Amino acid sequence: MMETLYDNNGTPVAYLDKDDGNTFFLWNGVPVAYLDKDYTVYGFNGMQLGWYFNGYMRDLKGYIVGFNKQSASIEVKASPIKSFKITKPVKRIKQIRRVKPIWKRNNSAICLSQFLANGIN
């Protein structure tokens, strides 16, 4: 099952492939992160990026970085055609999971594409 993720402008940036190890892919097929226990999002480089819970991608401070269609409060754009997936890299040793902050209603200062790019090896 695939779930599209949109940035705070409603542009599709990535998708979560639940059938491929809960991996987040960019539309060009690059695997950038994965969903771990307790809704924690880690990059393949081992960095904790944030959390994905109830359709919202949140940064380490609890601000909204992106969302799925069901959680959208704005009109979202059509998803592009997916490219072939690039082989996933080996997961590096994970950082110690941070304590979840209080969820904020505001958007993060970082865009979803940059947020996910922080997880690339």
Per-range role (PLM):
Residues 1, 18-23, 36-40, 53-56:
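Short "repeat-start/strand-capping" segments in structured domains, especially the N-termini
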Residues 1-12, 47, 53-121:
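Long terminal segments
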Residues 8-17, 21-25:
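Short low-complexity stretches enriched in small and charged residues
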